[in-house]
Curated annotation (Swiss-Prot):
UniProt-listed GO biological process terms: protoporphyrinogen IX biosynthetic process
Organism: Thermoplasma acidophilum (strain ATCC 25905 / DSM 1728 / JCM 9062 / NBRC 15155 / AMRC-C165)
Molecular functions per Gene Ontology: glutamate-1-semialdehyde 2,1-aminomutase activity; pyridoxal phosphate binding; transaminase activity
Designated gene of the protein: hemL
Official protein name in the record: Glutamate-1-semialdehyde 2,1-aminomutase
InterPro entries: 4pyrrol_synth_GluAld_NH2Trfase, Aminotrans_3, Aminotrans_3_PPA_site, PyrdxlP-dep_Trfase, PyrdxlP-dep_Trfase_major, PyrdxlP-dep_Trfase_small
Cysteine disulfide links: none
Amino acid sequence: MGSKDLFQRGSSLFPMGVNSPVRYFKDYPFYVDNASGSRIYDVDGNEYIDYCLAYGPSILGHADPDVVRAVRDQAEKGLIYGAPSEAEIRLGDIIRRSSKNIEMMRFTNSGTEATMHAIRLARAYTGRSIIVKMEGGFHGAHDYSLIRSGSGTLTFGSPSSPGVPEEVARTVVVGRYNDEANIRNIFSQYGSRIAAVITEPIMGNAGVITPEPGFLEFLRDITQKNGSLLIFDEVITGYRFAFSPYQDIIGIRPDLTTMGKIIGGGMPIGLFGGSADIMKKVSPSGDVYQSGTFSGNPVTMAAGFAALKKLQGMDYASLVRRTEKLMNGIDDILAKRKIRHVVNGYRSMFQFFFAESAKNYDEVMKADRDLYFRIFKRLMNHGVYVPPSQFETNFVSFAHSDDDISKTIEAFDLSVGEAAK
């Protein structure tokens, strides 16, 4: 059965035939049969070089044999116990040893859960209620994340999804990423009521937006001066650029960190952690409640440990070289055709925008979405899969070869030529 038929069947079961909106695109999404290494194969018999990589977890490539073996071995010993196991100790230990700032942690089942619990913990620890998030920053699908700015930079956010109560939105203030003056104004008005600022240190859910020099240091300074916590959402960036969270690369110590994706080796996972002083407020050692039937389940723990153990010896510089080659190739092709564009990226993640600039959410939202989608569809015709939306991120994995990069550049050149006609 092909993708079109499966989509018709799926549409009677799931809203628009999918279980996450990012997987849908017109006229219908492709349905995957299997994936291996840098390749993903659909049920229609097509093969693609994959740069979506499940939106970030698959840094080793699809179906890494060491991770698959670890999952199989653990599954034979039991899928879930409802009790602690050594598997969670092993994964927690390798994360703590490779992070300068995470003294204690708690595993969850998704990045959404991790940020939700981190926000609750920050409010409990500070005794304050207001959370500051960045416009366009994505921290999962819970109510406190699904907030966008109102008409003014100092107004409380309004819900960006029906079902989020206005009362919830009033506890979230939306700031502008890379805009120090805006954040200062927010603190001048609400400083004594702000529990925490939560931000992706590199925004990865509005395409890729990198921090301007000094911006993250500024956030650290202003939160400390006002008695607020700083939460880094490293669900995407944790272990993406080095064998550590991104915060260790730049030398900034947040109070709390959330992670996910890569640390699960492809299995569902989330984590929130930080100093022991803050984390000891989590139940049962403290009174901030958090739980989950599948939290710390042994199969996920085994997959995550196998992935991180393998990453520990990997050459991250090779990812940078291949990503830069691909970014430069894309930039050259678009410049040659005199197409207005920006290619944003950091080490092994990148995105291309058809805009004058892409330094913040407002600029990104002005990009030409139609041109991006036309190129996306043609790239698929030429055997390359990138995210259907330019507001997502491309990733390069250790499974991508130099030949993959060269083939992708060739496909991009053809696709741009076809889309620009």
